[in-house]
Amino acid sequence: MTSERDGTSATFGLTRRVLARLSAGALAVTPTLIAERRDFHRYAESGWTEFRTASLIARRLVDLGFDVKVGRDVLDPDARMGVPDVDVLEAAWGRAKAQGGDPEFLKEARGGFTGVVATLSHGAGPTVGLRFDIDALDLQESHAPEHRPEAEGFASVNDGAAHACGHDAHAAIGLGVARVLADLSSTVKGTVKLIFQPAEEGVRGAKAMVAARVVDDVD
């Protein structure tokens, strides 16, 4: 619904110009979004072991100008549920390091602290939170030649971990949203929090982020 007088959409009070920029921005980031989704798919990591995934997300958000918090700053250690044994965590952390995880943020995530929260603020206004899951399932991905990820070279290389529930896309979409918001930061008033949640499978990760008061200020 749009006012012909001022060109303002009733949806979120956005002007036609801003909506057009949102649409153009979404189209512009699509190739990068696809590439990142396939990268996350190829290096699938299950709950509390998303070390590579979380570290690369954090690095890209910092590069986009977001205020980024990770690790124990966004996860209450005592509220985490279903955390793997220490030897499993350490093996996954070492694998993430070998597979190109960001060194700075890998340190913060070590031990199963794989949450990321990015904030972008510009002036007074509401605080909106958007959540994105990042974990894979404990499954073995098919390597049959007709399986599209296998045929196109992005099937999971990590045995026993596969993105069969779309969280590779969730994570990539979150970064796509971040890129569009960064471009529009001077236009939109208020605060946006992008919450990249680990261990969604088994409903294990949200409690620890809530306990860390990540969403206390979200309207």
What is each model feature region?
Residues 168-219:
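Acidic/histidine-rich catalytic neighborhood of metal-dependent amide-processing enzymes
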Residues 12-163, 172, 183-188:
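Acidic/His- and Gly-rich active-site-bordering loop/insert found
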